[in-house]
Curated annotation (Swiss-Prot):
Keyword match Endoplasmic reticulum: no
Record note on modification: Palmitoylated by PFA4.
Biased composition (Polar residues): 34-52
Pfam family, one: AA_permease
Organismal lineage: Eukaryota, Fungi, Dikarya, Ascomycota, Saccharomycotina
Topological relation to the membrane, as annotated: Multi-pass membrane protein
Highest taxon of source: Eukaryota
Protein name: General amino acid permease AGP1
Length: 633
């Protein structure tokens, strides 16, 4: 330890009433680095732990149950319950924002999650926020989507999902602001706005989604390695990556944050470089194919499929991949709801989402369509015998650019590991939140002294063993199963958010409440939520059709159905099981019976109008550039 002494073990000296308070550095020290979390001893100490305690002993002691007394919470912070609804790639960004505040909402409520340590710094949050969305769905899953739909179908699918997502962000932002301290976050909205059974089923399917993501990413990592070698058993790499992910999570939030900082730096640099290089290759400035332009939109074509029905199926199949790629984007509305001026931040977050959809997703997808033909035998999901690779690698390597594809593939591997790391971390925390909501056994609420939900982490680790199918010849089939579960689960969550918003607005109207009580009103209103809800139901119906009658086949296929639609039977089973167990057969909560007061923050309508008028006046009297920034940002 350094000469600054061990801040984590400062004791009461000579039993006096004077407390020695730890400095802000406490927040940066994980427990297993520090030792015991015991209550202050009545025996005098020199102000730090005795030196004869070994590092090994302190490490093993850190796995003991965390005490939940007031004196033991000096280093603990309230983990906001909204983490149950946050995507892995962004989940810890909210933890940081809560840590930055000295008066966290709901602090010291006695929740088990109070023991989770606050160790994430602003630099971590910045890179985690920027890297959100750059994962398997965008970097690898788009290969299968391109094969099924063609470049135009892929673009249409992402554009449709992008329009839906914008409405979801608006609805989520409105409810996140008024229910900012609700246990369970937006996974809890359906429970008191729609129906308890529906809320239970959606919450568990959402947890299952992130349980599936970890083995999905590990399988994807082994597939990414095949670009370099196919002679080594893929399970060897799965073991290496599996141990790496668990080791990172043994170090708790601090290990997660540092790993994500490195991973996301690499992802941002790679995507920026690919965008620039892709344009140069397409116009003939690099590679050996000269000017390419939109050649592949004519040969082999903009859509895959000889008949219109096959083309439609291709677009429908793309929507699930797009949902998986967009997964977690709703988190932006959650975090902005907790900033100093959320009423102004949420509209900015919606604009930010538009820019992310346009530049991060649609722009790179257009480039992929220009540079990679959908009939390439190297694309995942193709029937050719070529070595499968990410479409981003193929986009560069197939045009004669050397060395760079290896760097891109390496960064894609890091991106995949980043998602595996995030999903493992988050699935364990989801189990913790389900336990606090009463939806899971209390054993999952076990928190050790280092702030790790050990039992939940053990379940996540066992589930990740599915990844060892990587050596199986059915590897791509397993990838399809896991991707379908994750993608459909995301659609269920988004549908639940929009349906909850519709019920919330209906209850406000029936009970005679003014919308002026809301700190922020969705710019798309109930019509936007209705559009998003209807579109997602239609997508689920279309996906059902694709599942029972796969693309290119005219006959029904039971195996293909479960490969692509397994999440739906799981949701139905959970819903019916809850209804049978609780003998509760009502379909929904009546609008006049919905509790609009509990957990809700009610804003002063007159004060809001005054603030809005003052803001507009400042813009009118301020410099022109501020009006430009306000319009675009």
């Amino acid at each position: 330890m350094s000469s600054s002494k061990s801040l984590y073990e400062l004791k009461d000296l000579k039993n006096s009433s004077t407390e020695i308070h730890a400095t802000g550095q406490d927040n940066e020290i994980e427990y297993f680095e520090t030792g015991s979390n015991d209550r202050p001893s009545s025996q005098p100490h020199l102000g730090y732990e005795q030196h004869n305690t070994s590092a090994v002993r302190r490490f093993f002691d850190s796995f003991k149950r965390a005490d939940q007394g007031p004196q033991d919470e000096v280093e603990a912070t309230q983990m906001n319950d909204l983490t149950s609804a946050i995507s892995p790639s962004s989940r810890q960004a909210q933890e940081l924002e809560k840590n930055e505040s000295s008066d966290n909402i709901g602090a010291n409520t006695g929740h088990k999650s109070d023991s989770l340590k606050k160790t994430i710094q602003p630099r971590h949050v910045l890179m985690i926020a920027l890297g959100t969305g750059i994962g398997t769905g965008l970097l690898v899953g788009n290969g299968t989507a391109l094969v099924h739909a063609g470049p135009a179908g892929l673009l249409i699918g992402y554009a449709i999902m992008g329009s839906i997502l914008y409405c979801i962000i608006q609805a989520c932002g409105e409810m996140a602001l008024v229910y900012s301290n609700l246990t369970g976050g937006y996974n809890a909205y359906p429970s008191f706005l729609v129906d308890d059974g529906f809320g239970f089923a959606v919450a568990w399917v959402y947890c299952l989604q992130w349980l599936c993501v970890c083995p999905l990413e590990l399988v994807t990592a082994s597939m990414t390695i095949k670009y370099w070698t196919t002679s080594v058993n893929p399970d060897v790499f799965v073991i290496i990556f599996y141990v790496l992910v668990i080791t990172i999570n043994i170090f708790g939030a601090r290990g997660y944050a540092e790993a994500e900082f490195f991973f996301n730096c690499c992802k941002i640099l790679m995507m920026t470089g690919f965008f620039i290089l892709g344009i140069i290759i397409d116009v003939g400035g690099a590679g050996n194919d000269g000017f390419i332009g939109g050649k592949y939109w004519h040969d082999p074509g903009a859509f895959n499929g000889k008949h219109a029905i096959d083309r439609f199926k291709g677009v429908a199949a793309t929507l699930v991949t797009a949902a998986f790629a967009f997964g977690g984007s709703e988190f932006i509305a959650i975090t902005t709801a907790e900033q100093s001026n959320p009423r102004k931040a949420i509209p900015g977050a919606a604009k930010q989402m538009i820019y992310r959809i346009l530049f991060l997703f649609l722009a790179t997808i257009i480039l992929l369509g220009f540079l990679v033909p959908y009939n390439s035998d190297q694309l995942l999901g193709s029937t050719g015998g070529g070595t499968k690779a990410s479409p981003y690698v193929i986009a560069v390597a197939s045009h004669g650019v050397r060395v760079v594809p290896h760097f891109i593939n390496a960064v894609i591997l890091l991106s995949v590991l980043s998602m595996a790391n995030s999903s493992f971390y988050s699935s364990a925390r989801l189990f913790l939140t389900l336990s606090e909501q009463g939806y899971a056994p209390k054993v999952f609420s076990y928190i050790d002294r280092a702030g790790r939900p050990l039992i939940a982490m053990g379940v996540s680790a066992l589930f990740a063993v599915i990844a060892f199918c990587a050596a199986s010849p059915k590897e791509e089939q397993v990838f399809t199963w896991l991707l379908a579960i994750s993608g459909l689960s995301q659609l269920f969550t988004w549908t639940a958010i929009c349906l909850s918003h519709l019920r919330f607005r209906r209850a406000m109207k029936v009970q005679g409440r003014s919308l002026g009580e809301l700190g922020f009103k969705s710019q798309t209103g109930v019509w936007g939520s209705a559009y998003a809800c209807i579109m997602m139901i239609l997508i689920l119906i279309a996906q059902f059709w694709v599942a029972i009658a796969p693309i290119g086949e005219g006959k029904l296929d039971a195996q293909a159905f479960f490969e692509n639609y397994l999440a739906m039977p799981i949701l139905i089973a959970l819903y019916v099981g809850y209804k049978v167990w609780h003998k509760d057969w009502k379909l929904f909560i009546r609008a006049d019976k919905i509790d609009l007061d509990s957990h809700r923050q009610i804003f002063d309508e007159e004060l809001i109008k005054q603030e809005d008028e003052e803001y507009r006046e400042r813009l009118r009297n301020g410099p022109y550039w501020k009006r430009v920034v306000a319009f675009w940002c």
